[in-house]
Amino acid sequence: ELLPIFCFDPTDAPNGLENFWGYSPINWFTPHFEYLSNESAEKNREEFRKLVEECHKADIEVILDVVYNHTSEGDYKGPAICWKGIDENLYYFIGKDKNYQDVSGCGNTIAANRGLVRKLIIESLKCWASEFGVDGFRFDLGIALSRGENLSPLDNPPIFEDIECEPELVDIKFISEPWDCGGLYKLGDFPSKNTFTWNGHF
């Protein structure tokens, strides 16, 4: 399992330090430029494909740690880097006070069950599975993806139903953290029949 490799903001760290963990994504479709040796985006994609191929030759499956629960843009005072600059009212949960609702602990929470947002997440998963050949995904704070309007937990979140029904993802492994920073904890009761969950107590 690889730590997040989506393109992320390396300056998202306190006191002038550098963020190298990758849990502040900017783009869900692009490998982080500092992890690869080429300046060309296409050559970087080819390089990552080659990495996956070599792992498979050695009988090693590749699981990506993916962060779809928030972006690097922080709260409403943060910079407009990706989805905030396109349509913040679509991509994020925003309260009546205009502040971002946050169960990620990072200042914002992606509204994963809205139609266009779901489609973007599904297309990202398909890209990494079909184009790059990865074998599975581990959802960071995965239960946050089950939240609907007003952050209400959904019994049957459309995002997980879409994943289960997507032909290109039928053989892909899914693993999730069954908790978020808003207190939702669904170990043994995760709302997706094809997702394994981490046991935080263990």
Which residues make up each language-model segment?
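Polar, glycine-rich mid-to-C-terminal structural blocks
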Residues: 155, 160-164, 171-202
